[in-house]
Amino acid sequence: MTAQTTAPALLTLDVEDWEHANYSQLDVSSVAAARKGRNYAMDQNTDRWIEICAGFQASSTCFVLGEFARRYPEAGKRLHSAGHEIASHCDTHALVYEMKQEEFRENLKRGLAAVGDLTGVAPLGFRAPSWSVSPTRTPWFFEELARAGLRYDSSEFPVWTPLFGRFGAPVVPYFEHGVLRVPVSVIQFLGMRMPFSSGAFFRLSPFWLLRAGFSSVTARGLPPMIVLHPRELDPGHPRLPIAGWEGQVHYARMASV
């Protein structure tokens, strides 16, 4: 009989509601129409997250959207009281690279205030909605994080996809403008980088790939990062009007979580 050990992982939750998404098929009116008449309470899923983590004596970092914090303030307080770190996911789910620097500064300021009001503590971390930052389109990004007093960022997706990410981005933590960057975990597979533990990739990855990914990242001396969303804890949540591959990315294998 051999002893089994478990390696630490970075468990993270992007705390947002079911309609917070960025796809070409969506606009303000279509999202508003989808939400009209829906009384779904996403805070039941953050409470479920607390229960799951408590069952494994685990804590997580929760990147809370300002809009969510104002809509469900008690949910954020319960996450904090349960020992989860509360960080910022910006104020709205707008794409950062579509904002001007001043717009982002104000959006970030509102988001930090909303989250800080929940805990009485200034957040130290940030993750951009849909990983929407890049050196070319948001060259001022870290200047603004540092200005706001943030210590670390988890907006780096080191694989290009049609929705986000970039080729050649570092896969290990590094500092930029005094802010620690913590990239999403990836695995080398058939000579290519492959994400496996974040959102849709976590849901779509077979168990053998998840296991290989965790082992590969751990062997490099790094803790694997897991990224989930409250909506992924309930396959029955309301749906947005998105079809095709975007709909598959957003909803495929929801029950697998």
Locate predicted features.
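Catalytic alpha-helical scaffold of carbohydrate-active enzymes acting on polysaccharides/glycoconjugates
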Residues: 1-190, 208-257
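Surface-exposed cleft-lining segments at the edges of enzyme active sites
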Residues: 36, 127, 194-204
